[in-house]
Amino acid sequence: MTIKLINIGFGNIISANRMISIVSPESAPIKRMIQDARDRGMLIDATYGRRTRAVVIMDSDHVILSAVQPETVAQRLSVKEEIIDEGQG
């Protein structure tokens, strides 16, 4: 299995293989999830003080805050997969 890395803004990179979901931080359940992760010490804030626009949930139970839109992160992931697929074919 190849390691796929995704840029989530400001030079911060995460492993796409470990990612479970990318969600918007607007809903109350996601806000509770962020607070719970902060209390447990499992929150990674990669926003550099900017507004949180995407919340990335990892399989290690870490919650990562990003300042880029969820659609942008998803697009970067799909472009990365297309490049890998073309290289194998």
Swiss-Prot record:
Coiled-coil intervals, chain numbering: none
Domain of life from the UniProt record: Bacteria
A Pfam family of this chain: RemA-like
The family this protein is said to belong to: Belongs to the RemA family.
Name of the protein: Putative regulatory protein BPUM_1466
UniProt organism field: Bacillus pumilus (strain SAFR-032)
